[in-house]
Amino acid sequence: MLNKLQQKWNVSSRKLFLILCTFAITGTSTAYVSRSITAWVGFNETTFWLWAFLLRLSILIFGYQIILLIVAFVFGQFKFFWNYEKKILRRMGVLPYEQIKLAIFASGKGSNAENIIQYIENHKNTHVKLIISSRPNTGVLDIAARYGIEAIVLDKKRFDETPEYIEILKSQGITHIVLAGFLLKVPQQLTAAYPNRIINIHPALLPSYGGKGMYGEKVHQAVIEAGDKESGITIHDVDDHYDNGKIIFQKKIEVLPTDTAGSLAEKIHLLEHKYYPSVIKKWVRR
């Protein structure tokens, strides 16, 4: 259970310990404050039960949140718990949701990119603001033009060696980056500028069949040649290495004896279209 919490919150063991201590001390402190205030206002066994219940409920709803932030500050976890509180307030409708602005990075035809754009169109707080292609004259640039989305063609050397594209992303207010068939390695300066805010989809079950040069039909051919009984998709956070970030979602399919690299590619493509947009929707709100 603790391992699952650590993975869900993406924190170190030490930070997880401090977070759990914060929750525990907050619960104990809230109970103490509730009893103290109840005694201070003079509530006892003869008090109408509803008044006592409403007072304690108010302390639980409002006092708990304040105490939680105070204890979190003491333990050096204020940022984590303030984000936690904001999520609760957004779900309650007290705070508006952050406006999510996506940049999609792609290298080819752009079918995944178009699928994401169509899905995102129905969500008022999320928008695709920018398409970045690693190649000129690609299908994804035509898609950008069709949907009226600004598009840029990367210069690989400048992408690897300068902060130019980070400045472009920031000037557009981009909050998250989605890789959709993007074949270049993401440079360290970009992952540092968008920590845990870059997502990728890989056409295999990582950690198998990942790494430099493993993309498209090369992956499916390797799966067929290995005689694997199953394959699938992996959606993961992006770090400084190829196909190495934290796994967010995986979906498996059976590889039939009659499958070829081409037929397997078609199956995997259907999985990508079915799951990638909905996973992105959850990912941007985590």
Language model features by range: what are they?
Residues 86-98:
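Membrane-cytosol interface motif
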Residues 16, 20-28, 32, 57-65, ...:
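Alpha-helical transmembrane spans of integral membrane proteins, capturing the lipid-embedded, hydrophobic core
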Residues 7, 38-52, 91-94:
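Membrane interface segments of multi-pass transport proteins and intramembrane proteases
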Residues 15-19, 49-57, 176:
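Residue-level signature of transmembrane alpha-helical entry/exit and packing/kink sites
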Residues 70-89:
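Juxtamembrane/interfacial segments flanking transmembrane helices
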